[in-house]
Each structure stands twice: as C-alpha cells, then as structure tokens.
From Swiss-Prot:
InterPro entries: HsdR_RecA-like_helicase_dom_2, P-loop_NTPase. The middle section of a putative type I restriction enzyme that if reconstituted might recognize 5'-GAN(7)TAY-3' and cleave a random distance away. Subunit R is required for both nuclease and ATPase activities, but not for modification. This is Putative type I restriction enzyme MpnIIP endonuclease subunit middle part.
C-alpha cells in the first residue's frame, strides 16, 4: 500500500488523523467509556466527512451510495470492542451505515516498507 501511494497508483482519498499529545501517562485504550465517546464522535462526523448524506427514493428506502471509510485500531482486542460499539450505536441512531471488520497480521508503516 505504501508503495502504491508513493507511486500514485491508487485512487485519491482524504484522511483525518487525530493525535493525542503524549504526557507520559498511560491511557486505558480499551476503556468502555472512551470507546463509546470516540465512536459517538466518529459517527457524528462521518456523513459530513464522507459526503455520504442519505438520499431516499421514498422515506422507507434509502438509496445506498457514497464513500467507504477505514477506522484503524491498535490491536485485535480494540478492533472487536470498537466493532461492537459501532454496531450498537449505528442501530440506536438508525444510521444508513454498514460496518465490517478486517484484522490483519501485518503492521503497515506509511511511506516506509512493510515491517
């Protein structure tokens, strides 16, 4: 993937990264409340960020079109917890979003070779 990006052989895409300043303290990345708030924030921003505004040919039938997104996690355990919370909130908010999970064993470092 990193070679394809460098060679410009992939479709153009946008990404948003959020970094937290490291103050030396340990963050419980699997904290249930933390995951809940991050998922809530992500879903609130998703439709605008992806220009994936729901369209309807009638009120009961949303037209499925738009863009996909990738939400990366630090571990398999984190991916599972985020997946469950996304499914729960998508259902509660009745959003026209589908979610899937892919767990890869290879660590990808942007603009460098695969490690």
């Amino acid at each position: 993937m990193s070679d394809a990006l460098d060679d410009e052989n992939v479709l153009c895409f946008r990404y948003k990264s959020y970094y937290i300043k490291d103050d030396g303290s340990r963050i419980d990345t699997l904290n249930e409340e933390r995951i809940k708030h991050i998922v809530d924030f992500t879903l609130d921003k998703y439709l605008d960020a992806t220009q994936n505004t729901p369209k309807f040919d009638n009120f009961e039938n949303p037209v499925k079109e738009g863009f996909n997104s990738i939400f990366a996690c630090e571990s398999k355990e984190a991916a599972i917890e985020y997946y469950k919370e996304f499914k729960k909130q998508i259902e509660q908010k009745k959003l026209p979003i589908k979610i899937a999970s892919i767990i890869a064993q290879t660590k990808v470092v942007m603009n460098k070779k695969l490690v």
